[in-house]
Amino acid sequence: LICYNTPFKDISKTCAEGENLCYYGKKDAVWNLYPIRGCAD
């Protein structure tokens, strides 16, 4: 599991097929870590 604590980190180069990643994003006006599956857009 790879988590980044910044919304500005480019994870597109580090993700792999089926890899579990986390991204720091704004949801409902709150910055937080959210789990995603696979590569980021």
Swiss-Prot record:
Belongs to the three-finger toxin family. Short-chain subfamily. Pfam families: Toxin_cobra-type. Keywords: Disulfide bond, Secreted, Toxin. The keyword Metal-binding does not apply. Disulfide bonds join 3-22, 15-39. Expressed by the venom gland. GO terms for cellular component: extracellular region. This is Maticotoxin A. The lineage of its organism: Eukaryota, Metazoa, Chordata, Craniata, Vertebrata. It is found in: Secreted. It comes from the Eukaryota. GO terms for molecular function: toxin activity. It comes from Calliophis bivirgatus.
